[in-house]
Amino acid sequence: MGLRPGIFLLELLLLLGQGTPQIHTSPRKSTLEGQLWPETLKNSPFPCNPNKLGVNMPSKSVHSLKPSDIKFVAAIGNLEIPPDPGTGDLEKQDWTERPQQVCMGVMTVLSDIIRYFSPSVPMPVCHTGKRVIPHDGAEDLWIQAQELVRNMKENLQLDFQFDWKLINVFFSNASQCYLCPSAQQNGLAAGGVDELMGVLDYLQQEVPRAFVNLVDLSEVAEVSRQYHGTWLSPAPEPCNCSEETTRLAKVVMQWSYQEAWNSLLASSRYSEQESFTVVFQPFFYETTPSLHSEDPRLQDSTTLAWHLWNRMMEPAGEKDEPLSVKHGRPMKCPSQESPYLFSYRNSNYLTRLQKPQDKLEVREGAEIRCPDKDPSDTVPTSVHRLKPADINVIGALGDSLTAGNGAGSTPGNVLDVLTQYRGLSWSVGGDENIGTVTTLANILREFNPSLKGFSVGTGKETSPNAFLNQAVAGGRAEDLPVQARRLVDLMKNDTRIHFQEDWKIITLFIGGNDLCDFCNDLVHYSPQNFTDNIGKALDILHAEVPRAFVNLVTVLEIVNLRELYQEKKVYCPRMILRSLCPCVLKFDDNSTELATLIEFNKKFQEKTHQLIESGRYDTREDFTVVVQPFFENVDMPKTSEGLPDNSFFAPDCFHFSSKSHSRAASALWNNMLEPVGQKTTRHKFENKINITCPNQVQPFLRTYKNSMQGHGTWLPCRDRAPSALHPTSVHALRPADIQVVAALGDSLTAGNGIGSKPDDLPDVTTQYRGLSYSAGGDGSLENVTTLPNILREFNRNLTGYAVGTGDANDTNAFLNQAVPGAKAEDLMSQVQTLMQKMKDDHRVNFHEDWKVITVLIGGSDLCDYCTDSNLYSAANFVHHLRNALDVLHREVPRVLVNLVDFLNPTIMRQVFLGNPDKCPVQQASVLCNCVLTLRENSQELARLEAFSRAYRSSMRELVGSGRYDTQEDFSVVLQPFFQNIQLPVLADGLPDTSFFAPDCIHPNQKFHSQLARALWTNMLEPLGSKTETLDLRAEMPITCPTQNEPFLRTPRNSNYTYPIKPAIENWGSDFLCTEWKASNSVPTSVHQLRPADIKVVAALGDSLTTAVGARPNNSSDLPTSWRGLSWSIGGDGNLETHTTLPNILKKFNPYLLGFSTSTWEGTAGLNVAAEGARARDMPAQAWDLVERMKNSPDINLEKDWKLVTLFIGVNDLCHYCENPEAHLATEYVQHIQQALDILSEELPRAFVNVVEVMELASLYQGQGGKCAMLAAQNNCTCLRHSQSSLEKQELKKVNWNLQHGISSFSYWHQYTQREDFAVVVQPFFQNTLTPLNERGDTDLTFFSEDCFHFSDRGHAEMAIALWNNMLEPVGRKTTSNNFTHSRAKLKCPSPESPYLYTLRNSRLLPDQAEEAPEVLYWAVPVAAGVGLVVGIIGTVVWRCRRGGRREDPPMSLRTVAL
């Protein structure tokens, strides 16, 4: 460490000052009972096990003293505290007894801890002085020491000569002048330390066998003063430092103060004896602002005693953890290896001090041998043509890493870390020259010796030496705008700088301090705020600084600092480290806080990239900001022994040494010369980083514009050679073996609109074939990314690609035979044309050349599927695709076919409909009618999604059949990168149209570039591991073949077997919830009802609730009621095999009552539903249910919480057509209300689900086949009519009125009056969607044999929908059914929302229940009648609007439909 024992006393004398030793803590009881224990000890057993330490003889040496050896505990020190502010007038309170009480409080807790090890320890003794009026503290301490010695000698319970004693000497340097950086230069009086040493000398002479804790409570006293805001006794004047005391200065001075005490005591005679020692025990708080005043427990007796015990358990020199309750540490225990109290000797403290210092650091220079160091022939006007020698001015913004804190400090000189060595700063320092000091400024001076702006020497940002290094130690992102303002003003006002003409390079690096403190305020230090603050600074530079190249260096990967902190073999002042960066170092491995830090760190980096990639700073030709990411993945440098290498750090182990500054400068310089997208993000700093030279072809500092050259890509592949022998197998095909590329498809492959300008909608008809992702060959990979341009990097003789523009018949198209608007049925003609062209063209050796043909089809089919669902069925789609592939398979040799998924129609809808101001929404029906004109949550949209799934499924089945794997020279590989598109979303939530042509449908060149990269990546990925997601905004580097895997991947060389679709064994669900416990006490309010609180389930309804036909009948008898499988009340089996509401609830409460089992009425439980029931039967069922509950001996009617589900209406609708004049809606609502009134009056503690009736006509439309015949025979007369009949239309209106009639029950006044009763309408059937199979037809597996009732699969889906509705707030419930199979669809209660939702706890309409007038019976028919009128008017308006849409004029772009 480098501190010399000879100067310890001198340092301590200078640091201590005049403060009177005293303690100020919060008043507490003087015994252990009633104490506020730290959170880690509350309600928990004593954590230490004394028995594990074994039974040993009492220690003969204080340096092997175990807690069990201690026989006596005592304390001295003047413990004065302010009284509790809540007890009245502070100045009138009697303070006479308080010092004794406080001391006894602390010592009692400490004695109780020790008593676990040494049960015979008597009550502690405190001698804290008896005077009320404060007087000289040193004199009082002498008196206390003498009284203590006399007391111990007279104590009959104590063997004074042979018993081990623990004596605590409390003192406080209340002036805290030692925290001023200038304290070492001020000759402060040293009386305080002299008297303390005198007291210790007295104790050493008089007291045998003693372990003395010298406890410094300076900060406790200060915090107590701040917390209570007043002192009764005169307090010493606070020390006003002559200069600003920064956080860094404070923690360094704290450490220095502590080390001075340690060094003094460790080298004193106290550590040389066997029966007496003194150990310094510091009490420093975390430096988090306002933490002290937030928690008075930081000054209570228990916390102080607990912290003192932990200090005794820590080796000297390793007492690094600050005092904290908010992030408390557990009580520490003696270990078997170190069962004793730590002294300086048994901590090997002096040995560590005297360890030979590392050799003095030699500053790293460099040599630059670049052939071209000349500036541009004329001063450039574009930042994208800027050579290093053109730079005239250099500046920097940031924090202490740029200010250079400690960069030139000698090893061990921790105090010198306060010095800012700006001349050594990596990004802007200019000390000496490049031969001795490597910095960016010194590198640039090799190109332009007249460079200005660099800093030299030492000093703060305001010193002349700093010049344009305006970084501020301790700076955070929020401070950057002020720094930027000052930098701009300095450049404008300095006569050496030609502000308008000089080219400037400014490096901005920030974020370390933000991450170090992020956990104290996640909102304040959020990634968004971080980048917003950077943006504000950059905005100033962008607005005011001409001719500037700004390096934005991303925040370093700070979590690796933990390696240095945790490695005890490497010396570091850990107290400083932890105080400077608590949020990185104080949390445990695998903690959620650490995971949050890593996430924030990554998001800081990602958000920085996004800020710049937005183009916000590329609006001028003379200004740009470039992200330099070399710090993003920096591993902790290691020594040859594998330990963290602290030679890369300043003596505080936090800031950079000159070696790190040198490596950072080299890495920054190299980053500046690397193209964007190809910049190095990972460095091993232990390896010296060579300085590269500008590329003679591209001699400029790299910007986004001059790197990408439009939409180019860098290919890092080194091995670009073809196979040694021309391959005969498609499974041994390398990229360089490909000689021909071709493509088939629709307008996406034809290239419509790829190069169109954003506002040029008519230009979308232009086919930019040369830019097409799979077949275009315009330019080169350096500026145009396409699959052919990638392949041309491997084989310059590649042919077949298209160039320029034109249709499929143009010469430029060559083998890109895609046709705009083409459908699957058109593929055959494209295949025929393609084969003929390949046979006729002399550039193609038809039989010998290896070919890659990419096929993408299906988008245009989906655009028209709704015009004829049979013509565009999945069966017809795959039939046409199969025929085309069969011809290629049969007639074209040496082919690898890429079969690419089509663009998901959902993405097209999101972009097109999400940007009505940018997209031609008026032309939706012309551009892609069956995709763009559908309503959200409509049956038509569900059918579109089913068709899309069916198309994809049929493609997979076709390829997976092995049909095209029968020849050695032919294979079809499905490339699935299009399966999941991650659509970029702008800050306003709208989809990003910058990836699309002006019609918002076709991809533009930006999109095509990503498609080409994704296709190439897929081609190199083995089957079974192919990427199925395309993130359009992600940086997608080009992957390369490897030596072990050099081939384009096929099923065979991937060792892949296509999976067989497994049969589904049951319709159970997986239970993934973690919040499953009941309330701590039985709730009295239905609005605080958790699922586990439910004791009883019940149900009312018809045959859908008795589960008629849920399973096939084994006889010709009438259908069976499978009550045990019923969605809302069945309890057969368990959730893993049968998904029902009771089986879900049984996961929360295994003792649930009331559910049905099996098929017999005797096991129906509280399922009172009956086949054929209508709404008029609900009151009778309600009475039946009430009687069953009252008569059940297992149910406590008054105390048990009950969940009742009512679902009725199907039979009412089925028979409506027999008497259409009846007031069905009015009567329906009245009957259900009567049933609910009965339940409300008779059942305490009840939660009632009222499920809206499904849309009957929608659910049963289009069943066809056997079901069509059964529908004509069943008792539901209304379903016998055709979909277009007036009767069926009238049924739909009545159906809507029934739903509307009961939809407001949740809000009715009479059901919100009781605290223990609620009615909640569950609307998942409001918009009923017919379940569809993979072919887009009605999925009959959801229905029973009679095609009317639900099968067990249908019951499972209803149970899931009901359960999920129950966990959704009123007003935000799902109003449509999603009948698709997944075992993981069940929602879970959360810690934030653990209750079943009612109107009140949904908080949507908090006052509605109180304000709504009571619903009168006479008002029901009126409401129903109004609802009917509204329904009729709404239907007419909707039809008119739809008719209006059909009359939109056609558009000429119809020919470019997908």
From Swiss-Prot:
Q: Where do the sequence repeats lie? A: 39-347, 362-707, 708-1054, 1064-1402
Cited InterPro entries: GDSL, Lipase_GDSL_AS, Phospholipase_B, PLB1, SGNH_hydro_sf
Topological domain (Extracellular) residues are 22-1417
What is the protein named? Phospholipase B1, membrane-associated
Listed GO CC annotations: apical plasma membrane; brush border membrane; plasma membrane
Q: Report the top EC class in one word.
A: hydrolase
Residues bearing carbohydrate: 173, 240, 493, 529, 590, 690, 783, 797, 809, 1055, 1113, 1275, 1378
Tissue distribution of the protein: Expressed in the epidermis (at protein level).
Query: Which keywords accompany this UniProt record?
Result: Cell membrane, Glycoprotein, Hydrolase, Lipid metabolism, Membrane, Phospholipid metabolism, Repeat, Signal, Transmembrane, Transmembrane helix
What membrane topology does the UniProt entry give?
Single-pass type I membrane protein
Q: What does this protein do?
A: Calcium-independent membrane-associated phospholipase that catalyzes complete diacylation of phospholipids by hydrolyzing both sn-1 and sn-2 fatty acyl chains attached to the glycerol backbone (phospholipase B activity). Has dual phospholipase and lysophospholipase activities toward diacylphospholipids. Preferentially cleaves sn-2 ester bonds over sn-1 bonds. Acts as a lipase toward glycerolipid substrates. Hydrolyzes fatty acyl chains of diacylglycerols with preference for the sn-2 position and of triacylglycerols with not positional selectivity.
- Gene assigned in the entry: PLB1
Q: Where is this region: 4 X 308-326 AA approximate repeats?
A: 39-1402
Write out the transmembrane intervals: 1418-1438
Which reaction equations make up its catalytic activity? a 1,2-diacyl-sn-glycero-3-phosphocholine + H2O = a 1-acyl-sn-glycero-3-phosphocholine + a fatty acid + H(+); a 1-O-alkyl-2-acyl-sn-glycero-3-phosphocholine + H2O = a 1-O-alkyl-sn-glycero-3-phosphocholine + a fatty acid + H(+); a 1-acyl-sn-glycero-3-phosphocholine + H2O = sn-glycerol 3-phosphocholine + a fatty acid + H(+); a triacylglycerol + H2O = a diacylglycerol + a fatty acid + H(+)
Q: Which GO terms describe its molecular function?
A: calcium-independent phospholipase A2 activity; lysophospholipase activity; phospholipase A2 activity; retinyl-palmitate esterase activity; triacylglycerol lipase activity
Q: How is it modified after translation?
A: Undergoes proteolytic cleavage in the ileum.
